[in-house]
């Protein structure tokens, strides 16, 4: 009886351990697959290189358009909208990590001038919150509040992303001035082709690593292929591994060249970057401009009145 209880206890512990292990795997895998902006955050101190190139282009190789819209000028300590548009054909499907086809996701990085930052929730109006949807923005670094990243997000719902931005106040931030500032943006649709470690994803074309004859093609049980090539130079065998997702373009017995595509290129997405300018406007300048315009209008009114008065005097003198 005691042995039976011991066996049941051990069995229960093993079952719990397996369950916990599965849960950890699922959670970890989900966090990695759904958090690709963290690749740039972990690998680069600044997402914009000295050349002006945004580092997301290192993984998303295809070039696609992106657009940003901001106000021409804003006042200090004011919340405004920065609208990023990532256009693409909504009918397109991308290759997922499991080799199946699915909808495209989108992501973006917004690089603001120093002092500008994501608006706190209590400063965002209900109208702007409705435009934002359920997106969760985050800072690129805890000490870089002017750089904001978002994604991945469902592309069909968020091909237009509204960032709520709070402008700085030079009265409280002495390193901020009333000037014209640049804003940079990068946006992608779809998965990348290269991982940060340099390895390929299954969302890209695979080329032959050797010239020769395709001697054997083995379709793997879980998807993908093993392609054996007899090297043309010395006859040794080279095995190229193709993951599930890309479509095979070669067949057994075919003669191929070095770097010849073995698969199609399944990528339908891409990355783009753009920029805009915004003026941090001094309220005193606006007041001065309004005062100047008012004085000009008053001067014109007085001039017209004076002219009419002069005409009346002339008419009176002519009557006598």
From Swiss-Prot:
Pfam families: Apocytochr_F_C, Apocytochr_F_N. GO terms for molecular function: electron transfer activity; heme binding; iron ion binding. Its main location: plastid. InterPro entries: Cyt-f_TM, Cyt_f, Cyt_f_lg_dom, Cyt_f_lg_dom_sf, Rudment_hybrid_motif. It is a single-pass membrane protein. The chain crosses the membrane at residues 286-306. Heme binds at residues 36, 56, 59-60. Residues 1-35 form the signal peptide. GO terms for cellular component: chloroplast thylakoid membrane. Keywords: Chloroplast, Electron transport, Heme, Iron, Membrane, Metal-binding, Photosynthesis, Plastid, Signal, Thylakoid, Transmembrane, Transmembrane helix, Transport. One of its GO terms (biological process) is photosynthesis. Its cofactor is heme. The keyword Signal applies. Binds 1 heme group covalently. It is found in: Plastid, Chloroplast thylakoid membrane. Component of the cytochrome b6-f complex, which mediates electron transfer between photosystem II (PSII) and photosystem I (PSI), cyclic electron flow around PSI, and state transitions. Belongs to the cytochrome f family. The 4 large subunits of the cytochrome b6-f complex are cytochrome b6, subunit IV (17 kDa polypeptide, petD), cytochrome f and the Rieske protein, while the 4 small subunits are PetG, PetL, PetM and PetN. The complex functions as a dimer. This is Cytochrome f. It comes from Dioscorea elephantipes (Elephant's foot yam).
């Amino acid at each position: 009886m005691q042995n039976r209880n011991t066996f049941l206890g051990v069995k229960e512990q093993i079952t719990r351990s397996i369950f916990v292990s599965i849960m950890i795997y699922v959670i970890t895998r989900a966090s990695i697959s759904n958090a690709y902006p963290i690749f740039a955050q972990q690998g680069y101190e600044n997402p914009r290189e000295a050349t002006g190139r945004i580092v997301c282009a290192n993984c998303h190789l295809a070039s696609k358009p992106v657009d940003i819209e901001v106000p021409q000028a804003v006042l200090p300590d004011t919340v405004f909208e920065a609208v990023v548009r990532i256009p693409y054909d909504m009918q397109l499907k991308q290759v997922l990590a499991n080799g199946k086809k699915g909808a495209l996701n989108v992501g973006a990085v917004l690089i603001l001038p120093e002092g500008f930052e994501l608006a706190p929730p209590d400063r965002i109006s209900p109208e702007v919150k409705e435009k934002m949807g359920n997106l969760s923005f985050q800072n690129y670094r805890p000490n870089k509040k002017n750089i904001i990243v978002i994604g991945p997000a469902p592309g069909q719902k968020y091909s237009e992303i509204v960032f709520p931005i709070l402008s700085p106040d030079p009265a409280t931030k002495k390193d901020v001035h009333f000037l014209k500032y640049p804003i940079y943006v990068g946006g992608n649709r779809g998965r990348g082709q290269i991982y940060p470690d340099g390895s390929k994803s299954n969302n890209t074309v695979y080329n032959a690593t050797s010239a020769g004859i395709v001697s054997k093609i083995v379709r793997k049980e879980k998807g993908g292929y093993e392609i054996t090539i007899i090297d043309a130079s010395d006859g040794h065998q080279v095995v190229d591994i193709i993951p599930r997702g890309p479509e095979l373009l070669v067949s057994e017995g075919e003669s191929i060249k070095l770097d010849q595509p073995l698969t199609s290129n399944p990528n339908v997405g891409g990355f783009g970057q753009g920029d805009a300018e915004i003026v941090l406007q001094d309220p005193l300048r606006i007041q001065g401009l309004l005062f100047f315009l008012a004085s000009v209008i008053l001067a014109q009114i007085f001039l017209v009145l004076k002219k009419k008065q002069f005409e009346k005097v002339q008419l009176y003198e002519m009557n006598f």
